[in-house]
A protein has these predicted regions:
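Short, well-ordered beta-strand elements
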Residues: 2-4, 41-44, 54-55, 70-76, ...
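Ligand-site clamp/hinge motif
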Residues: 31, 60-105, 223, 232
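Solvent-exposed coil/turn segments that connect beta secondary-structure elements
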Residues: 1, 7-11, 20, 48-50, ...
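Detector for C-terminal structural segments
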Residues: 11, 49, 123, 147-174, ...
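Short helices/loops that flank or line small-molecule/ion binding pockets
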Residues: 81-91, 108-109, 137-138, 217-229, ...
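Gly/Pro-rich hinge or "lid" segments in bacterial periplasmic/extracellular proteins
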Residues: 8-9, 15-71, 79-81, 186-187, ...
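Append "and occasionally in soluble cytosolic enzymes with long acidic Gly/Pro-rich linkers
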Residues: 55-60, 108, 135-224, 291, ...
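A ligand-binding cleft/hinge motif common to bilobed small-molecule-binding domains
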Residues: 98-109, 260-265
Length: 361
């Protein structure tokens, strides 16, 4: 019997127990044995080279469904062309993060099947709310009105995504609030700039294509769109190495990509709560934090829905984060690799469980 002692109520506990961060490993002399490679999944690690590849073999004693492969090798191929070439030539059986610029060519390749799955994965452009000029909510609103989200989806994602509304809850997820969609409106942006006394606003926006293929192009397009509102956005192309240690959470206006989280509480607690380590916009909103605490333990689904709707509205209208879009998961596989009719979109390769759920035909 597993007994979990909690400091406070959490209605999402069943979902948290399925999150990939929760792992169970062998214990040796009362300490976790990280080196054995054994866990509770269907495969065990036989070789691990960080940044190169990881190899798994199926546990002989696995008795549940799945784990149809005798072994699995996950290879790191950061270059999109290298990934797609490896798939076409048959060197690998499946790839993640298909290059959207060449996706139409890949679709025509013989023996290749594309998977396109709606996801809660999203891009954020967080602004430090405690650093000028972003400490003024009207400046933040001006920058939110100065971005043409649909054009970005069309030109950067080639249609493989859904429009964002400046909060992190995707239309494909529970508790999504059908709020009025913020649209590109340079005149409203000018209104808020004038209200803030920030006409002629100039800001720098940092990005790197290592975060997402097309990240810099997206920021350049945003910069062009913002000119109609009289906003000058200087796009800073940052080095790929060290982006997460030297740019994210360090510079006041940056490009970030988030994976989906299982519930609104997890996402809000990670990146929007006032004292969260990953509060990337330094946003402080007492009402939001009050609702976050209440919703965490609320078992009445109707009340919880209302709370999360208000929280999404607060993010949209007061928060320091622009959420331009949610990305689809675009993956590709050899036609002899099969999977269930429905696959997960929270992480790549069927919620990072493709090796468990998929099979060869």
């Amino acid at each position: 019997i597993l007994i979990i002692k909690m400091k406070s109520g959490n209605a999402d506990l069943p979902y948290l127990l399925s999150d990939y961060h929760l792992v169970m490993l062998p214990s040796v002399d009362g300490k976790v044995d990280w080196a054995s490679g054994d866990g509770t999944g269907p495969y065990k690690i036989v070789n691990h080279e960080p940044g190169v590849a990881t190899e798994f073999t199926r546990h002989e004693g696995w008795h549940r469904e799945g784990a149809y492969f005798d072994g699995v090798r996950l290879t790191v191929l950061n270059d999109a062309n290298a990934r797609q070439t490896a798939l076409i030539t048959g060197d690998v059986d499946a790839i993640t993060d298909v290059d959207l610029k060449t996706i139409s060519l890949l679709q025509r390749a013989p023996g290749v099947v594309l998977d396109n799955v709606a996801s809660g994965s999203h891009v954020t452009l967080p602004m430090f709310c405690d650093v000028a000029p972003f400490d003024n909510v009207d400046v933040r609103l001006a920058l939110k009105y100065a971005i043409d989200r649909q054009e970005i989806i069309d030109r950067i994602l080639f249609g493989y995504g859904s429009i964002g509304n400046d909060h992190p809850i995707a239309p494909s997820l529970p508790y999504w609030a059908d709020l009025e969609q913020r649209v590109y409106d340079p005149e409203k942006a000018k209104f808020h700039l004038k209200k803030a006394g920030a006409e002629g606003l100039k800001v720098s926006l940092s990005a790197a294509d290592s975060v997402m293929s097309g990240a810099v192009d997206m920021c350049v397009l945003y910069s062009e769109q913002a000119k109609a509102a009289g906003i000058d956005i200087e796009v800073v192309r940052e080095p790929a190495d060290g982006y997460w240690s030297n740019v994210w959470l360090v510079k006041p206006f940056v490009f970030v990509q988030w994976g989906a989280r299982p519930t609104p509480d997890v996402m809000f607690s990670l990146a929007y709560k006032d004292d969260a380590a990953w509060n990337e916009s330094h946003w402080q909103n007492p009402r939001f934090n009050e609702l976050l605490l209440q919703a965490k333990s609320e078992l009445d689904d109707a009340k919880r829905t209302q709370m999360y709707a208000e929280m999404q509205m607060l993010c949209k209208d007061d928060g320091g984060t622009i959420v331009p879009f949610f990305r689809n998961r675009t993956m590709a596989r050899r036609e002899n690799v099969q999977h269930p009719e429905e696959i997960a979109g929270n992480w790549e390769l069927d919620g990072a469980r493709g090796y468990h759920r998929w099979w060869f035909s």
